[in-house]
Amino acid sequence: MKRGIPWGASFVHFVIGAYMSVYIHGGLRSPIGVLNGQYKNTRPEILGAQLINELIKGHEINSVDGIFCGNAVGTGGNIGRLMGLMSNLSVSTPAVTIDMQCASALMSIEMAYTHIASGV
């Protein structure tokens, strides 16, 4: 069985036993801005929703099992959930936000992998 998650580094392949492989089939990141720069009036969940929509565009994805959002220096709340609500995904798509500063992106990939590999 092969399942992909639409975030993280491209072309990463994990093998789980002899039965299941987990693939990360694409990756993007939000733009990096500066204080009072071009994104000063743009909410981070809007940028995240644009990333989600861009990642699922061009792929035959019928549903997304979950959103795992790595976030540093957040303003509070579940930005992963807000991203999902503002994207083209179903409102029933669950989401979690991981806030570990510099380690949040890697931890979100690890959590998504564990979630998929365990069959949850």
Residue locations for each model-derived region?
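Intrinsic disorder/low-complexity signal
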Residues: 1-3, 16-17, 98
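N-terminal amphipathic/hydrophobic targeting modules at extreme N-termini
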Residues: 3-5, 9-11
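Conserved "HGTGT" condensation-loop signature of ketosynthase/thiolase-family condensing enzymes
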Residues: 13-93
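Active-site nucleophile and cofactor-binding loops and adjacent substrate-binding regions
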Residues: 72-73, 95-104
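Generic internal hydrophobic packing segments that stabilize the cores of diverse globular domains
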Residues: 80, 95, 106-109
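Active-site-proximal alpha-helical scaffold in enzymes
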Residues: 100-120
